[in-house]
C-alpha cells in the first residue's frame, strides 16, 4: 500500500502586517503588531504532540511600516529576520522543529535562518504575472523563483506550491509546475509541492470570484504528479477540500501539517481534520504515516544543522519518518 504522510504542527503567525496586497488575502492587517516571545512560548507550551513549529506570517513588514521597524528596534531587534531567528531558537529550546515561511528572503537571510529550521518554504503560486498580484512586489514570479533556487544552493529542504484559481489558465499551471521541476532537477532540495485551491474570502477584491472546480483541482494534481520528479511529494491541504480520497487517487501523497491546538490562520473558516477522520478518508487503501517537517530523504542525507540534530535523532525512526 502507498504511504500518505502528514506532520503534527503548531501554527505561529508572528504578524499580519505585510508589504503585499494580494486581491484574495483575508489574513493581512493594517493594525501594527507582532507576537511577543511570551505569546510564542504560550502557544508552544499548549501544543500537545506537535513536533513542527510552523512560522508563517506577513512578508517584510519592517520595510513598509516605519512603526513596525520602530517596534522591533524597541524590542532589541534590527530586522524581522533577527526576530524570526530568536523565535526559531525558542521553538528548538522547547523541543520543536521549526519550518519558516516568511515570504521573500535573500540568500544571506536564509543562510542565517538555516541552522534553526528543519525546512523552509515559499509558495511559487504561479510563475506568471497576474492581476491579483498587481500590488504585491513579493509576488513577482522572478523574485520567487530566485528565492527557491537560492534555497537549493544552500541545501535547505524546501516546500513550494501552486495556488489554483487566482486568474491563471491551465497552461500557466503546467508552466509553473515545469519551472518547479526544472529547479528540482538542478538542486534536489524540494521535498513537497502543495496544490492549493483558492477559496474566496469575504471583504477582499476577489470575494465573488468562483473557486476552482473539483475537476480543475484533480487535473492540477495529476499534472503535478506527471511533471514533478517522483521524489517530490504532492500535498493537498485536507482542510480546503471536502474529500481527500480522489486527490490521493490522482497522485497526491501528503496532507501537510495538522494541528490540534491552533487553527489555519490563513483559512480560518476551514478547520483542520482530526487524524482519525483522515484515516477514515483513506478507505483502507493507503497507509497514513506521520513525518517531520524535514522529509525522510533529507533526514537520511543529514541536511540539517547541529542545533537540530538532537531533536531529529529523538523524533525520527530508522526510515526518517516520525517515531510513533
Swiss-Prot record:
Gene coding for it: cofG
Subunit details: Consists of two subunits, CofG and CofH.
EC class (word): lyase
Function description: Catalyzes the radical-mediated synthesis of 7,8-didemethyl-8-hydroxy-5-deazariboflavin from 5-amino-5-(4-hydroxybenzyl)-6-(D-ribitylimino)-5,6-dihydrouracil.
Name of this protein: 7,8-didemethyl-8-hydroxy-5-deazariboflavin synthase
Alphabetical list of PANTHER family matching this protein: 7,8-DIDEMETHYL-8-HYDROXY-5-DEAZARIBOFLAVIN SYNTHASE, FO SYNTHASE (COFH)
SUPFAM superfamilies: Radical SAM enzymes
Stated family: Belongs to the radical SAM superfamily. CofG family.
NCBIfam families per UniProt: F420_cofG, PRK06245.1
Reaction(s) the record says it catalyses: 5-amino-5-(4-hydroxybenzyl)-6-(D-ribitylimino)-5,6-dihydrouracil + S-adenosyl-L-methionine = 7,8-didemethyl-8-hydroxy-5-deazariboflavin + 5'-deoxyadenosine + L-methionine + NH4(+) + H(+)
Organism lineage: Archaea, Methanobacteriati, Methanobacteriota, Archaeoglobi, Archaeoglobales
Cofactor field: [4Fe-4S] cluster
UniProt binding sites for [4Fe-4S] cluster: 18, 22, 25
Enzyme Commission (EC) number: 4.3.1.32
Domain Radical SAM core: start-end pairs: 4-239
Entry GO MF terms: 4 iron, 4 sulfur cluster binding; 7,8-didemethyl-8-hydroxy-5-deazariboflavin synthase activity; iron ion binding; transferase activity, transferring alkyl or aryl (other than methyl) groups
Entry-linked InterPro entries: Aldolase_TIM (IPR013785), CofG_family (IPR019939), Elp3/MiaA/NifB-like_rSAM (IPR006638), F420 (IPR034405), rSAM (IPR007197)
Keywords, alphabetical: 4Fe-4S, Iron, Iron-sulfur, Lyase, Metal-binding, S-adenosyl-L-methionine
Pfam families (alphabetical): Radical_SAM
Cofactor note: Binds 1 [4Fe-4S] cluster. The cluster is coordinated with 3 cysteines and an exchangeable S-adenosyl-L-methionine.
Pathway(s) where this gene product acts: Cofactor biosynthesis; coenzyme F0 biosynthesis
Amino acid at each position: 500500500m502507498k504511504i500518505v504522510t502528514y506532520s503534527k504542527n503548531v501554527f505561529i503567525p508572528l504578524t499580519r502586517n505585510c508589504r503585499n496586497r494580494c486581491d484574495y488575502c483575508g489574513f493581512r492587517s493594517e493594525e501594527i503588531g507582532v507576537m511577543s516571545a511570551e505569546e510564542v512560548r504560550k502557544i508552544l507550551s499548549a501544543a500537545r504532540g506537535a513536533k513542527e513549529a510552523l512560522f508563517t506570517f506577513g512578508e517584510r513588514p519592517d520595510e513598509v511600516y516605519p512603526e513596525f521597524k520602530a517596534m522591533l528596534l524597541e524590542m532589541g531587534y534590527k530586522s524581522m529576520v533577527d526576530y524570526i531567528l530568536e523565535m526559531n531558537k525558542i521553538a528548538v529550546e522547547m523541543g520543536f522543529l521549526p519550518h519558516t515561511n516568511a515570504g521573500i528572503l535573500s540568500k544571506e537571510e536564509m543562510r542565517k535562518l538555516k541552522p534553526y529550521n528543519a525546512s523552509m518554504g515559499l509558495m511559487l503560486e504561479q510563475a506568471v504575472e497576474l492581476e491579483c498580484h498587481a500590488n504585491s512586489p513579493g509576488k513577482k514570479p522572478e523574485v520567487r523563483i530566485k528565492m527557491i533556487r537560492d534555497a537549493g544552493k544552500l541545501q535547505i529542504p524546501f516546500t513550494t506550491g501552486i495556488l489554483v484559481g487566482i486568474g491563471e489558465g491551465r497552461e500557466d499551471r503546467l508552466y509553473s509546475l515545469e519551472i518547479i521541476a526544472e529547479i528540482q532537477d538542478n538542486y534536489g532540495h524540494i521535498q513537497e509541492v502543495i496544490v492549493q485551491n483558492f477559496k474566496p474570502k469575504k471583504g477582499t477584491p476577489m470575494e465573488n470570484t468562483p473557486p476552482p472546480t473539483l475537476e480543475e483541482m484533480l487535473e492540477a494534481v495529476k499534472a503535478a504528479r506527471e511533471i514533478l520528479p517522483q521524489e517530490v511529494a504532492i500535498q493537498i491541504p485536507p482542510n480546503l477540500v471536502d474529500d481527500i480520497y480522489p486527490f490521493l487517487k490522482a497522485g497526491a501523497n501528503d496532507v501537510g501539517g495538522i494541528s490540534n491546538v491552533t487553527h489555519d490562520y490563513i483559512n480560518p473558516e476551514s478547520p483542520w481534520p482530526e487524524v482519525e477522520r483522515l484515516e477514515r478518508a483513506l478507505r483502507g487503501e493507503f497507509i497514513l504515516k506521520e513525518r517531520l517537517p524535514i522529509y525522510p530523504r533529507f533526514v537520511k542525507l543529514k541536511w540539517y544543522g547541529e542545533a537540530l540534530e538532537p531533536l531529529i535523532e529523538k523524533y525520527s525512526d530508522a526510515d526518517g519518518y516520525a517515531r510513533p
